[in-house]
Amino acid sequence: MAGSTIPRRALGRILHQLRIQAGKTQLAAGLIIDVSPQVIGRMEDGIPVKVSGVQVKELLRCYGAEPETAEQALALFEEVKAAKGDPRGGWWRAYKDVTSSHFDHYMNLEEACTRLTTFQMTLLPGLLQTPAYRRSMILVKEPGRSALDVEREIELGIRRRVRLLEDHEFEMNVFLSEAVLRHRVGGPAVMAEQLGHLADIGQSPNVSIRVVPREADGYIGLVVGQFTLFEFPVLRHSGLREPPVVFVEVFTGALFFEDSEMIQTYRTAVADIAEVALDEGDTRQMVLDVAKEYSA
């Protein structure tokens, strides 16, 4: 389910374009509907704000929106309102005390997308981690974390996996460096369990897992580094589709890219990585073989 994130972003994009075409500043736009320029800016950025349908209509009128564009914008506004009533929306915010500052934005995208493609060189993506694997990584990064905080973060990971297992319209394509399988996280028993889980979940119809073997010659993934590409569905009422977003995480923060040329660069990288990755069957066999090594 797209929730309110994607229609909000699409509405903001339309309002921004119309305001620029009308030659109005955010201050001028705010005066039209009696809000601050900051509210206009947040609305255009797809951030939740308190505005009414009447105010949106007035902006569209003053911007000189064509009837078709105005109809699209109002349909998006109605989608945002409808999604706000979904009790499942933003469930992860209950864990904000144990997550990073960029996690809310990441989860908005994860919950809204229908296809997630990720390339990982060091660790398994969160959606595929077992509790023991996740617990080990939390304590490596933050050895002083309280037991309660650690368990809450693990609980969050378990809840995130529900969509992967139950929503078959959600597609996850995972490319892993072989090194991910061989980095010993938590010891042999933890890794054996983790790789067994990886082999099992890779058989789900909506999950594709492919490993780039260490024998692969130099390939673009070594230069590009780790990333996640989010792709979104067509919105039900407006018929619009939001452009993809690329997420890149670093040790001290994260970057979100929306520029179309940047997105195309990452799409090309996905295609190049796919050229050197094992197919799903050979990947599963490798995962099981490495799991046996840990169990020996």
Residue ranges, per PLM feature:
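Interdomain hinge/linker segments and adjacent boundary elements that couple functional modules
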Residues: A2-R13, Q17, Q21, L27-L31, ...
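Short glycine-biased active-site loop of nucleotidyltransferases that positions the nucleotide triphosphate
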Residues: G30, P48, Y219-L222
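Conserved catalytic-loop position in the HRD/HxD motif
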Residues: D34
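C-terminal regulatory/effector modules of DNA-binding transcriptional regulators
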Residues: L165-E169, F175, L181-A296
